[in-house]
Amino acid sequence: MTQLSSSDVPGMGRRQFMNLLTFGSVTGVALGALYPVVNYFIPPRAAGAGGGTTAKDELGNAITATGWLSSHPEGDRSLVQGLKGDPTYLIVEGPDAIGSYGINAICTHLGCVVPWNSGANKFMCPCHGSQYDATGKVVRGPAPLSLALANVSVENDNVFVSQWTETDFRTGDKPWWA
């Protein structure tokens, strides 16, 4: 074999080197900027056996059933972070029982957070006056639909919220939110 002389070997010129350096830098910045966007669409990993997400308090701490039941009386409806971080009401059904379903607190009219009015025993939207009964069924408009439901389960004292796919027990219809 013959060796090529150094003058016959093509070298990388300054312009080509700068082009490669610029391309690499722009690609790195673009991938770095896209990471949070892609990460947004990946579901959270903290899940129960049913594929739900861990219910969290207003500070983002995981909720334990014993802790929740010790600080909330029977019949209480209090907000937690549920599916996709949406505000969801956990229902205390007894001194040692959290309800098997949660109620999404987002109004079906314009998306306001609907507070629980314990005096009237219903959810009342402050934005346009929609009202929902204790189960989240719409009783007065302008909201067109009942509040969405979520399954609630307790496993090893951890509270999990998962997608509701069963028939809506309030209307007998398929869930509109699934």
Swiss-Prot record:
Bilayer-spanning residue ranges: 20-42
Cofactor: binding comment: Binds 1 [2Fe-2S] cluster per subunit.
Residues given in the record as [2Fe-2S] cluster binding sites: 107, 109, 125, 128
The enzyme's E.C. designation: 7.1.1.6
Subunit field text: The 4 large subunits of the cytochrome b6-f complex are cytochrome b6, subunit IV (17 kDa polypeptide, PetD), cytochrome f and the Rieske protein, while the 4 small subunits are PetG, PetL, PetM and PetN. The complex functions as a dimer.
Disulfide partners: 112-127
Miscellaneous notes: The Rieske iron-sulfur protein is a high potential 2Fe-2S protein.
BP GO annotations: photosynthesis
Keywords: 2Fe-2S, Disulfide bond, Electron transport, Iron, Iron-sulfur, Membrane, Metal-binding, Thylakoid, Translocase, Transmembrane, Transmembrane helix, Transport
Full protein name: Cytochrome b6-f complex iron-sulfur subunit
Necessary cofactors: [2Fe-2S] cluster
Any single GO CC term annotated in Swiss-Prot or TrEMBL for this entry: plasma membrane-derived thylakoid membrane
Family: Belongs to the Rieske iron-sulfur protein family.
Keyword Amino-acid biosynthesis: no
Protein topology in the membrane: Single-pass membrane protein
Predominant subcellular localization, coarse grouping: membrane
